[in-house]
A protein has these predicted regions:
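Signature of the chorismate-utilizing enzyme
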Residues: 1-210
Length: 210
């Protein structure tokens, strides 16, 4: 990483490719998901079109931008964090400006750098920022997921299902590449059990849902 540019985080990709005949997206994700605090697996639902027949895995988050409860929160690779004041009038224009300002803080170059973007989701509740639709806003003690969150990952793995190819892209240099390759070769995969605690409940009553 080079921060010679004021307020800009500059990275250059390190890339490696291999045949994916011995790997599956789920199998690779299970081997890599514990490398960082956040990881994602996004699989394509279209295996017939070569342009869309891809799956992506992101691990080792570097930065993120999230929208929740009228606030926009940004975190950066140097540990800095910004949180906007609560704004009941937060709209699509404000969010677009925040995303543009966030993206301008990063300069990523090198082979396959087009894959080093933001990965995340926009939830159904985010409709409140784009349309005149009221959404019940509740803060939960657990699993209080943002309405919108997108993350820049240090490491991206791209499965090209049409050509049976796996491309590994890292912003962590050769050391990052070696770490990923070592994790890929692990024979054992740690699994975690889960069970429900208590009875199912909903924040919306049957009448409200109707």
């Amino acid at each position: 990483m080079d921060n010679s540019k004021t307020n800009t985080f500059a990275y250059t990709t390190t890339v490696s490719s291999m045949l994916a005949d011995l790997h599956t997206p789920v199998g690779v994700y299970l081997r890599l998901r514990d490398l960082g605090a956040v990881s994602v697996l996004m699989e394509s639902s279209d295996y017939h079109d070569k342009d869309n027949s891809r799956s992506f895995i992101g691990v080792n988050p570097l930065a993120s931008i999230a929208v929740a409860h009228g606030r926009i929160e940004c975190s950066y690779p140097d540990g800095t964090r910004t949180v906007s004041s609560p704004d009941e009038q937060l709209d699509s224009s404000c969010i677009a400006d925040a995303f543009n300002a966030f993206l301008q803080r990063f300069d990523i170059t090198g082979e396959q750098s087009n894959h080093c973007g933001l990965y995340g989701y926009t939830s159904f509740n985010a409709v409140r920022y784009f349309e005149q639709i009221e959404v019940k806003d509740e803060t939960q003690s657990k699993n209080d997921a943002p309405d919108i969150v997108y993350t820049l990952f240090r490491d991206i793995l791209v499965f090209d299902h049409f050509n049976n190819k796996l491309t590994i892209i890292t912003l962590g240099g050769q050391a990052g590449m070696d770490e990923l390759r070592k994790a890929l070769m692990r024979q054992s995969v740690q699994t975690f059990g889960f069970k429900a605690v208590g009875s199912p409940s909903s924040t919306v009553s049957d009448e409200e849902f109707r």
